[in-house]
């Protein structure tokens, strides 16, 4: 069956939209918003009508007939923790997206705009594998400090999309496999996927795991406490050291991994040291996730922007191929992943989950 889908992925200073016929992209647009436009609104939710109008206007400009749409799909926002899958957008979800129960984020607008347009057209609206996807085993939640449980914050949409893609490509099905998925972008998340559930994963935003282009990953916690109480830093300055100015930015003042590798290959010893540590930490975290799966790993999947690297990918492969064979799905296609999530429901392959 043929479905036309409008996909909405709001970012902090832009809104990315795509129109798909099944998995074929008809067109894609990145609608950029100036600081002046964004500053007019006190909260993220206040931007709702402005962003919705911008989307409808571009569709009108392209002479696209929105009455031909089968469903609207939004990027999932900072909801309460949920298991992965495609969710029908309902009133309970809208209320939580409005207030941002786990924090303010532009992606909170994805479901809100999707439902608003969908309701006007009398068609369903969905979100797919939001960033708060949480399928951790109970044992993976304990950190050692009762007040500080481990949290599942990772690249759920892309990790799930490539895991399902490998399930299809291999003919074995995602639900029948044990996979380790490594997303390498601005942050690095390494997930243990056990028969369709991400039973353990590092908190790639501000928790633990390998350092990345912009994030610190796991740090020595005693020294971090001393830093916090040294009187030299505000809370936000310490947080920025962990998220934004950590990793490559902290050591080399750049988040450009390709540029660092180029310098290393031209003989820069400092770049070589940081690159080798980055590779080492990802390797070590893959080993942890192999242990979380009791050594029963069918395949390791590498994805995200850094998975295009002709240097890092072979280096990482040679470090971990003793655990399981490695398949590479470079980059990430969030719009396609959102479309695929809706198609699985419209085709009856999956049932829409209720929030």
Swiss-Prot record:
Gene3D superfamilies: 3.30.420.40. PROSITE patterns: ACETATE_KINASE_1 (PS01075), ACETATE_KINASE_2 (PS01076). Keywords: ATP-binding, Cytoplasm, Kinase, Nucleotide-binding, Transferase. GO terms for molecular function: acetate kinase activity; ATP binding; butyrate kinase activity. GO terms for cellular component: cytoplasm. InterPro entries: Aliphatic_acid_kin_short-chain, Aliphatic_acid_kinase_CS, ATPase_NBD, Butyrate_kin. It is found in: Cytoplasm. One of its GO terms (biological process) is acetate metabolic process. The keyword Secreted does not apply. It is an enzyme of class 2 (transferase). NCBIfam families: butyr_kinase, PRK03011.1-5. Belongs to the acetokinase family. This is Probable butyrate kinase. It comes from Clostridium botulinum (strain Alaska E43 / Type E3). The lineage of its organism: Bacteria, Bacillati, Bacillota, Clostridia, Eubacteriales.
């Amino acid at each position: 069956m043929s479905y036309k889908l409008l996909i909405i992925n709001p970012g902090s200073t832009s809104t990315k939209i795509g129109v798909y016929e099944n998995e074929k992209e008809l067109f894609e647009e990145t609608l950029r918003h100036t600081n002046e436009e964004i500053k007019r609104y006190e909260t993220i939710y206040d931007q709702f009508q402005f962003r919705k109008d911008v989307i409808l206007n571009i569709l009108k400009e392209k002479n696209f007939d929105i009455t031909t749409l089968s469903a609207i799909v939004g990027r999932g926002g900072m909801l309460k923790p949920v298991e992965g899958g495609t969710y029908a957008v309902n009133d309970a979800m809208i209320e939580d997206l409005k207030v941002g129960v786990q924090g303010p984020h532009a992606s909170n607008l994805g479901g809100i705009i999707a439902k608003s347009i969908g309701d006007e057209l009398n068609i369903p609206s969905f979100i797919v594998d939001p960033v708060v996807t949480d399928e951790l085993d109970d044992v993976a939640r304990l950190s050692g400090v009762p007040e500080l449980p481990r949290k599942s914050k990772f690249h759920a949409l892309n990790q799930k999309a490539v895991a399902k893609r490998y399930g299809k490509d291999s003919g074995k099905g995602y639900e029948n496999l044990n996979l380790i998925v490594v997303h390498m972008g601005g942050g690095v998340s390494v997930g243990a996927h056990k028969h369709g559930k991400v039973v353990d994963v590092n908190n790639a935003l501000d928790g633990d795991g390998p350092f990345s282009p912009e994030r610190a990953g796991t740090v020595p916690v005693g020294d971090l406490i001393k830093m916090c109480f040294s009187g030299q830093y505000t809370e936000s300055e310490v947080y920025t050291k962990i998220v934004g100015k950590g990793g490559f930015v902290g050591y080399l003042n750049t988040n450009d991994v390709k540029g660092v590798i180029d310098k290393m290959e031209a003989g820069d010893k400092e770049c070589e040291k940081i690159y080798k540590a980055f590779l080492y930490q990802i390797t070590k975290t893959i080993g942890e996730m192999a242990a979380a799966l009791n050594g029963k790993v069918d395949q390791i999947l590498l994805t995200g922007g850094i998975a295009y690297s002709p240097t890092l990918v072979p280096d990482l492969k040679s470090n971990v191929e003793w655990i399981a064979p490695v398949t590479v799905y470079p980059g990430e296609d969030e719009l396609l992943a959102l479309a695929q999530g809706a198609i699985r429901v419209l085709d009856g392959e999956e049932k829409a989950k209720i929030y």
